[in-house]
Amino acid sequence: MTQDYEVEFVERGEREARILVRGITPAFANGIRRAMVADVPTFSIDTVRVIENTSVMFNEQIGLRLGLVPLTTDLDDFEIGDEVTLSLSVDGPSTAYSSDLVSSDPMVEAADDNIPIIDLKEGQRLEVEADAVLDTGREHAKHQGGVAVGYRHLQQVEVVGDLGEFEDDDPNILRGVIEEQAAEHAAGDATNGELVATDEFDNDLRNRYPGKDVEVSDVPNAFVFHVETDGSFTTEELVLRAVETLRDRATELKDAVQL
Amino acid sequence: MMVPVRCFTCGNVVGEHWEEFKARTREAEEPEDPEKVLDELGVERHCCRRMLVSHKDLVDIVSPYQ
């Protein structure tokens, strides 16, 4: 199956992006989504050696909290299974934060600085040594780089007539992204073919097409992905790595079945 | 006891916003509307919002009984 596809950014940010992909099947779109969630590895603390813990939490609870802290991951320099050691040593009274984690490798450190690990009172102390390991979301959810990754069909709105003067004035809620097809009826500036996120008109089609009767339909084979990362890497890195794992597996299958 | 690091449902990191959320909605002299604070912090989904809205710090309550 060879088919042309096209990729376009609707919104683009470090940690959150919306990407429109045209010319792919629903099955392939779901494949990309699953690859983003399960197949792109990130660093996460996996083993904790407790040297001293006189806090109000058990060692296991501290270990769980440390495991969930996102760590910056550069996938060019590490392979699955690589380990990096981090240490944490805090004396009470104070709070241990994710920024107190000291890494042996400057490329792997806490992506968010303000996450409270444990509140320490007078005389309490926490000292641990932890090994972070690079692994995939398939292995454990703490290794997932993508957060709330999903997709929707791109939608188009067709104006089919005017609303009657005494018609019910119910909200016409729509979420996602629409491709403008009826610019002449739209409120404000609009050009046909433009991509409009529905939150621009408060998710209510009455605001976009005042007084018009509209019908919404899906644009075939066009999907808008919503991609968010936990800070381990950028959205761009996540999507590219996900597609790469898909390609690698397809190539592997092709080689395996060749005569 | 301590605020969860991540949202149970979607896995977004919410722990980093806790202290600001707490300071602005519960400890300030004129507490702000939690809805507004969460919007400003960029905690959008209702799964993540409930993590902060429904949380109570218990370390101070538990610590005398060590």
UniProtKB/Swiss-Prot annotation, chain A:
Keywords: Cytoplasm, DNA-directed RNA polymerase, Nucleotidyltransferase, Transcription, Transferase. Its EC number is 2.7.7.6. SUPFAM superfamilies: Insert subdomain of RNA polymerase alpha subunit, RBP11-like subunits of RNA polymerase. GO terms for biological process: DNA-templated transcription. DNA-dependent RNA polymerase (RNAP) catalyzes the transcription of DNA into RNA using the four ribonucleoside triphosphates as substrates. PANTHER family: DNA-DIRECTED RNA POLYMERASE, DNA-DIRECTED RNA POLYMERASE II SUBUNIT RPB3. This is DNA-directed RNA polymerase subunit Rpo3. It comes from Haloarcula marismortui (strain ATCC 43049 / DSM 3752 / JCM 8966 / VKM B-1809). The gene is rpo3.
From Swiss-Prot, chain B:
Binds 1 zinc ion. Zn(2+) binds at residues 7, 10, 47-48. It is an enzyme of class 2 (transferase). GO terms for cellular component: cytoplasm; DNA-directed RNA polymerase complex. It catalyses: RNA(n) + a ribonucleoside 5'-triphosphate = RNA(n+1) + diphosphate. One of its GO terms (molecular function) is zinc ion binding. InterPro entries: RNA_pol_su_RPB10, RNA_pol_suN_Zn-BS, RPABC5/Rpb10. It comes from the Archaea. Its cofactor is Zn(2+). The keyword Mitochondrion does not apply. GO terms for biological process: DNA-templated transcription. Keywords: Cytoplasm, DNA-directed RNA polymerase, Metal-binding, Nucleotidyltransferase, Transcription, Transferase, Zinc. Pfam families: RNA_pol_N. SUPFAM superfamilies: RNA polymerase subunit RPB10. The keyword Transferase applies. Its EC number is 2.7.7.6. It is found in: Cytoplasm. Part of the RNA polymerase complex. NCBIfam families: PRK04016.1. Belongs to the archaeal Rpo10/eukaryotic RPB10 RNA polymerase subunit family. DNA-dependent RNA polymerase (RNAP) catalyzes the transcription of DNA into RNA using the four ribonucleoside triphosphates as substrates. This is DNA-directed RNA polymerase subunit Rpo10. The gene is rpo10.
